[in-house]
C-alpha cells in the first residue's frame, strides 16, 4: 500500500508549498537523511516549503518482517518497527484569504501578498497563474507538463518572490522619507513643475505634459509629480537614498530562509555601478532612480515589506511564513512597537527596529500617501473607500517591467497601505499591470 501526500486546495497553495514527487539519483545522493530512509515509491519535496523543510517533514518508515511458508502465507512475525510521522509545521497563511487572492487574480499573470504590519506574518502569498501540484504526485503526463511549461503567463514562476520589476513611482514614499531624514527637504519645500526638467542638455519629462505648477511634498505625492522627485533625488543623491531603501528591505531577500528561488533584487548606488559595470555614476541616473526607474529591480514581496514598515510607523519587522514556537500576538506586537520594544519571538533577542531618525517624517509620508488615495486629484482617488474603518493610503506608478521571458513592457504599479490597520497587501498585475500594499 502506498500512502501519498494530497493537496486538498489544489492550486491555492502551489507557490507556497511547492509539491512532492519521486527523487532522482542526485537528490538521493545529496541528502543523507533521504539516503537512510529511502524506500521505493518514496516522495520528497521538489519545490517551495516542501523542498526547504524536507528534513523536518520526512518521517521514518514502519518495518514489518514475516516468515512465510512455501505458499507465501505468513506464519511468524520476525520484526516490527513503528514508523514515525515527520514534524507538524503550521503556516501563518490564512486559507480563506489565500483563496480570495486567487479568485481576484483569476488566472491572470500577477501576485498578491498580505503581511501583518506588526508581527511580520505572511497572511497570504499568491502567484498567478498557478497549477495543481497533485499532478506531480504520481508522475505528470507529457501533455500536462507541456501545457504548464509553455503557458506564456509562466505559472512555474513564483512572481511574488522571483519576479523582478522596476517599482516606478511606488518608490516615491521612500525617496520622500530619505530626503526628510537627511534634512534635504521639509514640508514647505516646493518645486515648480512645467512638465519637464532640463539638466546638462538632457530633458527629463513629468508624466503630466503641461506640468503641475508649484507643488509641495503632499501634492507631489498625491499627483505623483515626477519633476518634484527628480529635484528631490538630485539634492539627496543616490547613495543616501540607497541607505534608506535598504533599511526598508529593498535590495534584500525577504523570505530567503524559506524559499531558495527568491530574488534579492537591486537598489543601486555609485559603488555598485563602478564595481559591476566599470563606469561612474551620472546625475541623470539619480533622477530616474528617484522615480523608480533605471537600474532598480524589486520583487512584490519587497514592496509589501517596505510599505508595511511605513504603515506601522517605521518599525522593523521580521517577515515569516511559519508560526513561531512562541508566537507573539498582533496586540502584543503592536503594543511593544508603540512602547519602543520588540523581541524576536524565536531568539527572544531585542530587534533593532527603529528605521527612522525622526518619527514625524514617517507621519508626513503616511499623510502624503493618504492624500493620494483620499483627496481629489490623487492618482488613486478612484480606488478610495469612504468608510473610515477601511480607508487606506496608496501610491500609484508606471514603470518598465523586466521579466524572465518577456521583453520590456509598460507596467502600472500601485502600492496601497492601511496606515492605521494591521495588514499590508502587495498586489501585482502583470498583464494589466498594478501593485498594492494594504
Label the model's feature ranges:
Residues 1-111, 126-159, 164, 331-348, ...:
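Extracytoplasmic/periplasmic proteins that interact with beta-lactams or build/remodel peptidoglycan
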Residues 24, 61, 109, 189, ...:
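Secondary-structure boundary/capping signal
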Residues 112-117:
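Short hydrophobic alpha-helical segments used for membrane anchoring or interfacial signaling
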Residues 68-78, 118-170, 174-430:
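Beta-lactam-recognizing serine transpeptidase/beta-lactamase-like catalytic domain environment
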Residues 429-438:
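Single conserved hydrophobic/aromatic residue that forms the stacking wall/gate
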Residues 50, 218, 362, 437-438:
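Short, structured helix-loop boundary elements
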Residues 27, 204-205, 437:
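Short, well-ordered strand-loop elements centered on a beta-strand within folded domains, enriched
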Amino acid at each position: 500500500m502506498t500512502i501519498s501526500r494530497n493537496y486538498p486546495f489544489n492550486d491555492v497553495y502551489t507557490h507556497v508549498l511547492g509539491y512532492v514527487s519521486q527523487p532522482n539519483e542526485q537528490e538521493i545522493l545529496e541528502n543523507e537523511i533521504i539516503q537512510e530512509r529511502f524506500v521505493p515509491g518514496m516522495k520528497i519535496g521538489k519545490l517551495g516549503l516542501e523542498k526547504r523543510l524536507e528534513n523536518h517533514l520526512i518521517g521514518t518508515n514502519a518495518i514489518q518482517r514475516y516468515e512465510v511458508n512455501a505458499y507465501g502465507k505468513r506464519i511468524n512475525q520476525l520484526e516490527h518497527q513503528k514508523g514515525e510521522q515527520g514534524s507538524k509545521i503550521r503556516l501563518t497563511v490564512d486559507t480563506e484569504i489565500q483563496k480570495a487572492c486567487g479568485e481576484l487574480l483569476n488566472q491572470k499573470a500577477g501576485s498578491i501578498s498580505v503581511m501583518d504590519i506588526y508581527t511580520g506574518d505572511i497572511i497570504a502569498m499568491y502567484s498567478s497563474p498557478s497549477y495543481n501540484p497533485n499532478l506531480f504526485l504520481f508522475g505528470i503526463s507529457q501533455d500536462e507538463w507541456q501545457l504548464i511549461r509553455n503557458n506564456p503567463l509562466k505559472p512555474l514562476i513564483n512572481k511574488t518572490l522571483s519576479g523582478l520589476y522596476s517599482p516606478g513611482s511606488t518608490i516615491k514614499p521612500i525617496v520622500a522619507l530619505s530626503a526628510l531624514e537627511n534634512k534635504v527637504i521639509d514640508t514647505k519645500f516646493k518645486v515648480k513643475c512645467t512638465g519637464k526638467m532640463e539638466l546638462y542638455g538632457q530633458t527629463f519629462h513629468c508624466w503630466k505634459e503641461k506640468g503641475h505648477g508649484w507643488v509641495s511634498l503632499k501634492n507631489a505625492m498625491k499627483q505623483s509629480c515626477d519633476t518634484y522627485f527628480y529635484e528631490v533625488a538630485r539634492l539627496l543623491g543616490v547613495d543616501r537614498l540607497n541607505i534608506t531603501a535598504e533599511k526598508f528591505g529593498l535590495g534584500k531577500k525577504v523570505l530567503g530562509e524559506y524559499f531558495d528561488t527568491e530574488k534579492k533584487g537591486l537598489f543601486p548606488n555609485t559603488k555598485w555601478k563602478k564595481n559591476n559595470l566599470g563606469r561612474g555614476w551620472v546625475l541623470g541616473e539619480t533622477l530616474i532612480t528617484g522615480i523608480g526607474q533605471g537600474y532598480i529591480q524589486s520583487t512584490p514581496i519587497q514592496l509589501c515589506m517596505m510599505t508595511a514598515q511605513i504603515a506601522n510607523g517605521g518599525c522593523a519587522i521580521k517577515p515569516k511564513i511559519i508560526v513561531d514556537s512562541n508566537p507573539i500576538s498582533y496586540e502584543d506586537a503592536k503594543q511593544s512597537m508603540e512602547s519602543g520594544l520588540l523581541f524576536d519571538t524565536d531568539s527572544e533577542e531585542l530587534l533593532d527596529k527603529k528605521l527612522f531618525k525622526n518619527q514625524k517624517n514617517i507621519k508626513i509620508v503616511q499623510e502624503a500617501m493618504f492624500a493620494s488615495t483620499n483627496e481629489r486629484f490623487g492618482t488613486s482617488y478612484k480606488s478610495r473607500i469612504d468608510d473610515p474603518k477601511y480607508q487606506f493610503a496608496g501610491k500609484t506608478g508606471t514603470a518598465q517591467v523586466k521579466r524572465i521571458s518577456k521583453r520590456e513592457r509598460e507596467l502600472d504599479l500601485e502600492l496601497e497601505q492601511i496606515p492605521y490597520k494591521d495588514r499590508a497587501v502587495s498586489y501585482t498585475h502583470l498583464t494589466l499591470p498594478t501593485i498594492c500594499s494594504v
